[in-house]
């Protein structure tokens, strides 16, 4: 964390990849109290997927990358995410945020299923594109707030990060970052 200017992180490995690992991660400037990664149900012929969860003093951040092959597999992955979050944080008063690449458009069955237990915080209208960074034409990346424990926060602002002072997003990722500014 010191080498990264005070940032800490946790990485959830989904699979080996080109001599390293492929998965999801969370970076934070706050002290991580606890963390865990769980394997999600795997769609037939698809890559392994995981949910990585980081608990901080005032809130919880979870991240995932859902299956890109099958909406049926995505439904099973959403069910598992909901089960894990309910089991671990159902009795907590901390807000639980879930972000990631859901490989699902706003009008998809997967997003409809998520909206039963989660509130989408990031822009997701007809022109709010997050993929691809080379030629954005669809919204598949979101940050959500879990409704299951009644925890509240105020959304101060949201943004799809199209402009940067430094760096080239088109070279850094095939996705455009999304941002939510919240107040507790």
Which residues does each predicted region cover?
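Extracytoplasmic/periplasmic, Sec-exported soluble proteins
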Residues: 19, 43-46, 69-73, 102, ...
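Structured beta-strand-rich core segments of catalytic domains in phosphoester-bond hydrolases
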Residues: 1-59, 66, 155-160
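Active-site beta-loop-alpha substructure in enzyme catalytic cores
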Residues: 61, 69-87
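Metal-dependent phosphoester-hydrolase catalytic domains
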Residues: 72, 86-97, 103-184
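N-terminal, active-site-proximal structural segment of metallo-dependent hydrolase catalytic domains
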Residues: 1-4, 16-20, 79-83, 174, ...
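Generic enzyme active-site microenvironment
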Residues: 63, 98-99
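Extracytoplasmic/secreted envelope proteins and their assembly/folding machinery
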Residues: 1, 24, 78, 82, ...
């Amino acid at each position: 964390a010191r080498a990264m200017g005070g940032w800490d992180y946790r990485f959830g490995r989904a699979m080996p990849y080109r001599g390293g690992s492929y998965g999801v991660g969370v970076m934070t400037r706050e002290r991580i109290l606890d963390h865990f990664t769980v394997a999600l149900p795997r769609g037939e012929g698809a890559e392994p997927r995981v949910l990585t969860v980081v608990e901080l003093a005032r809130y919880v951040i979870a991240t995932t990358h859902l299956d890109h092959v099958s909406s049926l597999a995505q439904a099973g992955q959403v069910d598992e995410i909901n089960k894990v979050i309910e089991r671990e944080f159902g009795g907590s008063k901390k807000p639980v945020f879930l972000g990631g690449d859901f490989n699902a458009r706003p009008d998809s069955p997967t997003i409809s299923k998520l909206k039963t237990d989660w509130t989408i915080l990031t822009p997701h209208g007809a022109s709010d594109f997050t993929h691809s960074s080379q030629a954005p034409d669809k919204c598949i990346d979101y940050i959500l707030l879990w409704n299951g424990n009644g925890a509240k926060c105020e959304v101060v602002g949201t943004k799809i990060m199209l402009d940067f002072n430094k760096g080239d997003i088109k070279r850094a990722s095939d996705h455009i970052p999304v941002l939510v500014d919240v107040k507790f």
